[in-house]
């Protein structure tokens, strides 16, 4: 997957001399505003990036030019991550550049750029995967305009807040489009995951147990498995030297093969019932794919807690169900009816979890 930056070009791009109308331009009837515009009248990218030039997505020629760039990328890669994808949608773009667009007589296109361009790329390269960097209310827009996956920054926010009810409510409220979500704890724009969780590896690992076992893309960043604390700066292409966090390394040695298995990719996902006085600190769900079954239980709380996890398909047609906790390797046998009705009793350390395989 390659990075496609649609919103702007370099200030010294050859496009600038070919056709300035590719770009948003300052109105000549107002005093020059150096906060948002270069001396030649071309706008900074997004009014914030002062070293790049803002492309005009209400100009059909610009749209055609950028669609050609997408086709070139699609010919070279399996997909593209589209930088600040929401910023070129009609609604956002008009809100950002309304005065300039009106002055130069640009009107709102009948369709969004992504809707047309993604369809054309997929016509020529059907297997191309599109990932949108998007936030807030524009998430649904990017899905409806054709993206295969969209950033899920909100899950990271809720996990950072540390409120289990908040995380649970979010997962239920987004269930309709959960398969489109790209789940991540860090990326090139964000700080390292540990910084969101008080630099405590146990909390970071517990967040990973949640983020990477719910439906959607598992969007992993370079060296995530080493538990580094210092951000890998894009412009420097390096970070401070630091030792690997051995607790994180040992955790991912066991966890990585688990959450990348087929059952978590292609299986059927379902939230499960949790019982007991401590149920409010737990999150739990199960997956089923062909003959494989998994149930994930996470205690996202400081203290050791206990609960009953109701697994209605445990030991179907059998008196007993055989289970193995995959992170520890511990095997147990329980009465099927007990697990189906009362629930599997578990005691889980603070900020920890269990992943069971069962028949």
Outline where the language-model segments fall.
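Active-site and adjacent substrate-binding regions of carbohydrate-active enzymes
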Residues: 1-359
